UniProtKB/Swiss-Prot annotation:
One of its GO terms (biological process) is translation. Belongs to the universal ribosomal protein uS10 family. The keyword Ribonucleoprotein applies. It comes from Streptococcus sanguinis (strain SK36). The lineage of its organism: Bacteria, Bacillati, Bacillota, Bacilli, Lactobacillales. This is Small ribosomal subunit protein uS10. It comes from the Bacteria. SUPFAM superfamilies: Ribosomal protein S10 (SSF54999).
Length: 102
């Protein structure tokens, strides 16, 4: 797999679990002999939801909820077959969405 690049994009609601998953991926890739660029923090998506607290009236009484999606990007340059096999067997924490592009 010479002159190839694997781009891994991670998404999670909690930044601590996201950083642990990114550290596991980087450690696995470097242990198998591939070059790693990252983890690069991407902009955090912020969704804001405003709802009325009361069921029927009192529109002035509202509550706001926020949901943040943290993202990281990892590039693995010149991966070997050993790197790909190790990444496929890697156990990541639940709650982390992984997108892989070759």
């Amino acid at each position: 797999m010479a002159n190839k690049k694997i781009r891994i994009r991670l998404k999670a609601y909690e930044h601590r679990t996201l950083d642990t998953a990114a550290a596991k991926i980087v450690e696995t890739a470097t242990r198998t002999g591939a070059e790693v660029a990252g983890p690069i923090p991407l902009p955090t998506e912020r969704s804001l939801y405003t709802i009325i607290r009361a069921t029927h009236k009192y529109k002035d009484s509202r509550e706001q909820f926020e949901m943040r999606t943290h993202k990281r990007l990892i590039d693995i340059i010149n991966p070997t077959q050993k790197t790909v096999d190790a990444l496929m067997k890697l156990d990541l924490p639940s709650g982390v969405n992984v997108e892989i592009k070759l």
